[in-house]
């Protein structure tokens, strides 16, 4: 039975249903079996659970389709069954809602969850692709009989906006819920209210919060949301989960859930149900607790509905707060990469950094497990070098070894330790390193990591939560002017600039003409570049780099010349080549990034002599 949702929540508190996946798991839908697939493999079980919720008092039920989008079904090789799974889910809920046995009928919400893949620039999914995936699911849900559409458990409001843009064309009511982590700061910083205003400004029929926290913690969230936009929806978990015998379990204190369900209604929730871990017993207790509740009798509240446009945005300036950043703006900066040893003693690295500082180097670069080798964390090494050698460090951060939470945690730690020059890299595959069987995470890539750094420089983490004072990172990334697919490399450079990168460290260049061609092809782009220079030490090294290392091109005349020189004279020639390129390139770039052999970091000092001589021309 279809009803006007907006009118419904004005007149009373409506009871929602509870978890579907929790009960499916308890009743035998095994691990690895996507819950949405049960719509076609276990239809009677799904329909039966819907009916239990309606009998318990739910006036609104959700389809079993939270994870039924193309991307999530693709994990189980079910991407060609999106329409079938969603239509079946809507039909089963519709049947339960309209059953004479279960009462007067209930409203059916077609449930749509997040994509399960990150959006550009953090991940590969474009906005157009995202809308298409949401649209496909919504069409099938409405075809199956859903009365309205529910966008639930979103953390990213950009993704939520894209979902709403995709589904609003159908003219049916749309509800949209964000999930919050309530850790005290969430409330003190006013995030629920800000999120509610942003969600409501999209034009949704009802904003709300669901999942992640229990009913007690959700009360404060709902108070913040309702104070800004009026009536909202609340679907808490019963509490925090625990792992028992390899399975996720929640406490079943239905009285506690019902007690705080009433408090949620008093806080401004007009649609109250349950999320993960809740059961028909929770819903029945909730319905009993709210049976005689009337919104007009709730404690008086100050409610002011505003839109995002009415709020003056706080200006946050993205200003790198490092000496290297200043040097790149006002002069010509020199950075030298120094390799870390396998162990935890980096005394030689510190000593090399001191010597290089004395030769005029502005910063030391420390890689993050380059070529997938086990090394000390670059931030820890950077802190030691900065303290003991008195020179700034550029810490390379790779996306290979940490998920998106770990990456942000490391960056917060870097900021706290004073390591604020960060070079964002995707990372080499584990297959070429010390542990080829290790898992490569790659939640994002270098473009996405640049975006994360830029958000932190605006005082936010990736989810939009405040991190306090912006750290002032210098955001660096890589650019290869000698790439085989130069157009693709330039397009990626453009994306990195758009994501918030300040400067770019190039791959080693051995021919000035290649650099000039790349700069010409950049067109309207004018990136801050540190030119990569690698003083070659032997013909063997040159042949290896040219033939076996992607992205490195060494002209044949240089390789031939090295092959004619002794082991003593070859490094001298390698330095001469680097100096010559630098001399010609210095008017074209903002700095130099010297990569000496791991065993001979002082070779960079010979190149720096030429840099120092040239500096007066640009000072």
What function would you assign to each model-found segment?
Residues 1-619:
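Domain-level signal for soluble alpha/beta catalytic cores
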């Amino acid at each position: 039975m279809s009803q006007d949702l907006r009118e419904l929540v004005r007149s009373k508190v409506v009871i929602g249903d509870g978890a579907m996946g929790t009960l499916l798991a308890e009743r035998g839908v095994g691990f690895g079996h996507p819950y949405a697939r049960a719509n076609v493999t276990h239809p009677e079980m799904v329909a039966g659970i819907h009916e239990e919720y309606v009998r318990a008092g739910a006036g609104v039920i959700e389809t079993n389709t939270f994870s039924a989008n193309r991307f999530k079904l693709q994990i189980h090789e079910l991407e060609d069954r999106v329409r079938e799974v969603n239509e079946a889910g809507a039909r089963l809920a519709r049947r339960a809602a309209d059953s004479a046995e279960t009462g007067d009928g209930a409203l059916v919400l077609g449930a749509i969850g997040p994509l399960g893949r990150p959006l550009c620039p953090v991940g590969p999914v474009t906005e157009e692709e995202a809308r298409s995936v949401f649209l496909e699911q919504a069409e099938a849900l409405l075809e199956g009989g859903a009365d309205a559409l529910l966008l639930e458990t979103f953390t990213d409001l950009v993704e939520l906006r894209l979902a709403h843009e995709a589904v609003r064309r159908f003219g049916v009511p749309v509800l949209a819920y964000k999930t919050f982590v309530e850790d005290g700061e969430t409330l003190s910083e006013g995030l629920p209210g800000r999120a509610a205003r942003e969600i409501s400004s999209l034009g949704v029929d009802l904003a709300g919060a669901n999942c992640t926290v229990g009913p007690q913690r959700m009360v404060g969230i709902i108070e913040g949301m309702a104070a800004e936009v009026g009536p909202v929806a609340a679907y808490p978990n019963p509490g925090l989960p625990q792992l028992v015998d390899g399975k996720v379990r929640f406490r079943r204190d239905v009285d506690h859930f019902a007690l705080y369900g009433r408090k949620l209604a008093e806080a401004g929730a007009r649609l109250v149900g349950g999320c993960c871990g809740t059961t028909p017993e929770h819903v029945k207790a909730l319905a009993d607790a709210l049976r005689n509740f009337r919104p007009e009798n709730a404690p008086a509240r100050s409610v002011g509905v505003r839109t995002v446009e009415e709020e003056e945005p706080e200006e946050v300036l993205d200003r790198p707060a490092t000496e290297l950043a200043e040097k790149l703006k006002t002069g010509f900066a020199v950075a030298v990469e120094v390799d870390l040893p396998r162990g935890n003693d980096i005394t030689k690295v510190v000593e090399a950094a001191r010597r290089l500082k004395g030769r005029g180097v502005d910063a030391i670069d420390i890689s993050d497990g380059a070529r997938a080798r086990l090394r000390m964390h670059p931030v820890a090494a950077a802190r030691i070098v900065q303290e003991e050698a008195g020179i700034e460090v550029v810490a390379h951060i790779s996306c290979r070894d940490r998920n998106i939470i770990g990456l942000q945690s490391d960056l917060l730690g870097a900021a706290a330790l004073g390591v604020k020059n960060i070079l964002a890299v995707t990372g080499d595959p584990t297959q070429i390193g010390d542990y080829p069987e290790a898992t490569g995470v790659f939640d994002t890539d270098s473009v996405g990591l640049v975006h994360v750094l830029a958000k932190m420089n605006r005082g936010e983490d990736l989810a939009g939560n405040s991190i306090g004072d912006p750290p002032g990172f210098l955001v660096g990334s890589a650019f290869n002017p000698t790439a085989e697919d130069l157009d693709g490399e330039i397009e990626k450079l453009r994306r990195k600039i758009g994501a918030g990168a300040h400067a770019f460290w190039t791959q080693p260049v051995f021919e000035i003409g290649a650099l000039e061609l790349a700069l010409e092809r950049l067109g309207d782009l004018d990136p801050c570049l540190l030119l990569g220079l690698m003083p070659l030490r032997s013909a063997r090294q040159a042949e290896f780099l040219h033939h076996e290392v992607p992205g490195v091109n060494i002209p044949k005349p240089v390789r031939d010349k090295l092959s004619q020189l002794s082991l003593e004279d070859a490094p001298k020639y390698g330095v001469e080549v680097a100096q010559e390129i630098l001399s010609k390139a210095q008017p074209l770039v903002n700095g130099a990034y010297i990569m000496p052999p791991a065993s001979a970091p002082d070779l960079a000092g010979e190149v720096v002599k030429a840099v120092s001589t040239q500096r007066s021309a640009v000072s």
